[in-house]
Amino acid sequence: MALREIIILPDKRLREISKPVTEVTTEIRKLADDMFESMYEAPGIGLAAIQIAEPVRLITMDIVRKEGDGKSDPRAFINPEIVGASSEMNVYEEGCLSIPEYYAEVERPKTVRIRYTDLDGNVKEEDADGLFATCIQHEIDHLNGVLFVDHLSKLKRAMVIRKFEKAAKRGIKYV
């Protein structure tokens, strides 16, 4: 496993649409391992491959670890897609490893049905709700070049993007 640098807004690569994974290879499994290590070190509960400058449709998540009781449930999702969503909405305060130290409430479907491939190459479908639903939607957005600030008002989004552009020009690096 290797610790990888997480790219930060305003890096244009965050707006790239990630390419599908055509085969679950040793390289994809190693990338997932690197992502878990980088995600835990950050620390975060979800990471899309594009956030470490790898434009492939791979997500790692561990929402159990957020509880802080030493438990863990690392999960990898290859080519994840939302195949159904509830009309009922939920609001969570979201943050992002690529937009450090900024949090905002985002409204998303309360439950979603996802289809994905696991690291053994098995295609699976499952229902997600609560934090799992919010996190998987947030990470799938990354694979499509969408950031959580894109769900905010134009004014709030512009303020956040401007803040990070100014910081980048001044050479301020978030860690």
From Swiss-Prot:
Reaction(s) catalysed (UniProt annotation): N-terminal N-formyl-L-methionyl-[peptide] + H2O = N-terminal L-methionyl-[peptide] + formate
Biological process (GO), any one: co-translational protein modification
Binding positions (Fe cation): C96, H138, H142
EC number of this enzyme: 3.5.1.88
Keywords annotated in UniProt: Hydrolase, Iron, Metal-binding, Protein biosynthesis
KW Transcription (keyword) present: no
Coiled coil: none
Names of the cofactor(s): Fe(2+)
Keyword Heme: no
Cofactor binding mode and count: Binds 1 Fe(2+) ion.
Residues of the active site: E139
GO molecular function: metal ion binding; peptide deformylase activity
Taxonomy, superkingdom: Bacteria
HAMAP family reported for this sequence: Pep_deformylase
Similarity field: Belongs to the polypeptide deformylase family.
Protein name: Peptide deformylase
Organism: Rhodopseudomonas palustris (strain TIE-1)
